[in-house]
Amino acid sequence: MDIRSTDTSLLTWTGDTLALGLPEGAIEIAGELAELNDKLGGNLGDLISETEFEGKLGSSAATRLGGGPIRKLILVGLGKTADFDLQTLRLAAAAIARLAKQQKSQALAISLPVVGDQSATAGAITEGLLLATHQDTRFKSTKEEKGAKLETVELLGLGEQASAIAKSEQICSGVILARELVNAPANTVTPLTMAETAEQIAAEYGLSLNILEQEECESLGMGAFLGVAKASDIPPKFLHLIYKPQGTPKRKLAIVGKSLTFDSGGLNIKGAGSGIETMKMDMGGGAATLGAAKAIAQLQPEVEVHFICPATENMISGRAMHPGDILTASNGKTIEVNNTDAEGRLTLADGLVFAEKLEVDAIVDLATLTGACVIALGDDIAGLWSSDESLAAQIQEAAKLAGEKFWPMPLEEKYFEGMKSQIADMKNTGPRPGGSITAALFLKQFINNTPWLHLDIAGPVWSDKENGVNNSGATGFPVRTLVNWVMANN
């Protein structure tokens, strides 16, 4: 899809399909809309009245106009003017893209209000278009593409914004990579595949890559990570991908993503009704980490970023860790495994220790960590825990810019009492109440002084149905937040 911005107004544009975004309220055909209505032979007014279109958020209407200067007309509602933000533009662009597909449009022009500035507006619209039109059909034997495809999109009245559009295309390439990694089944994406993906990113964009094999992980004392990996016939891969700017970096950051390419639960096996068939998505944190790496490598900020993915499976075999085993993490702390299905935090423990040894300025980890977080916050909102208020504020600002939702959660130290072990330093799970909080408190034991933030993304990494800029399946959450955070440190 070729997306470009232009000074052309909606009154002078001619072509296949014109899409307008209109705010909520009684829509008056006056001024520019009156001129457009005249140009379209009264069809704009007819469409508004016949469909009772009032501009409510999520509403839309479309019609074919015949053989005039514009052949199809699309209207989308933007909601209340006071609530306009960049996410309004993304959602409007996504709705327009889907309607244009239904109308079999090949050339599309979009007229939406400016939010912030023209550059930010063009970028947000581009994101909405690209993310809504992405369809992962790799595993279909018969492709469902029929008829015309959307080939060109003009963003009207925004002037030349090629740089902003290119930036959004680069960010979306990372989101799409994350989506496709999560969408793929566990017999396609394994720890080896994760390593190959990291190699491709490193080769294409000039990043450094260090893949720690099992023996190297053993030499570093990564007993928690390797305890999870023991049962799988596929060897673990501890991935360390590094982006460095050409000059002196302004900051050094680390992103650590949980990378369980399949989670059977281990000997505490996931039973009927547990959603075991969806556990290909348990590497959503690692997928987003690699997606962010791909985007950041293209954007080239003056920030050094370390992307860390402890990749393995959690399987069942004669070698599997047992409930009751004691593991020693790479910082020397001992863990009594009272549930083998709380394995993600074990892999992250060694990932966090590794990250802190790099002497970075801040560490963010992200993981599909707990069902408890989904119960608390639902499918659309991720949980956020942090030891540092400034870092938490940075991530929340980055998320707001991306239109991705997080909710700050407490690190209630009292709850860690339930994770204390009589024979080790800690257990890997606590009592059922506050399960997402105790999981975050567990991770906190593997950070000393570096500002640290944990994201539990178990809900938003997947959507069972079309939702905003996402189609059903993997969402690529929260690649755009991570990228915005890194760029804000630039």
UniProtKB/Swiss-Prot annotation:
Its EC number is 3.4.11.1, 3.4.11.10. It holds the Pfam family Peptidase_M17. InterPro entries: Leucine_aapep/pepB, Macro_dom-like, Peptidase_M17_C, Peptidase_M17_leu_NH2_pept, Peptidase_M17_N. The keyword Manganese applies. Mn(2+) 1 binds at D263, D341, E343. It catalyses: Release of an N-terminal amino acid, Xaa-|-Yaa-, in which Xaa is preferably Leu, but may be other amino acids including Pro although not Arg or Lys, and Yaa may be Pro. Amino acid amides and methyl esters are also readily hydrolyzed, but rates on arylamides are exceedingly low; Release of an N-terminal amino acid, preferentially leucine, but not glutamic or aspartic acids. Binds 2 manganese ions per subunit. It comes from the Bacteria. Its cofactor is Mn(2+). The active site is at K270, R345. The keyword Metal-binding applies. One of its GO terms (biological process) is proteolysis. Keywords: Aminopeptidase, Cytoplasm, Hydrolase, Manganese, Metal-binding, Protease. PROSITE patterns: CYTOSOL_AP. One of its GO terms (molecular function) is metalloaminopeptidase activity. Mn(2+) 2 binds at K258, D263, D282, E343. It is found in: Cytoplasm. Belongs to the peptidase M17 family. Presumably involved in the processing and regular turnover of intracellular proteins. Catalyzes the removal of unsubstituted N-terminal amino acids from various peptides. This is Probable cytosol aminopeptidase. It comes from Microcystis aeruginosa (strain NIES-843 / IAM M-2473). The lineage of its organism: Bacteria, Bacillati, Cyanobacteriota, Cyanophyceae, Oscillatoriophycideae. The gene is pepA.
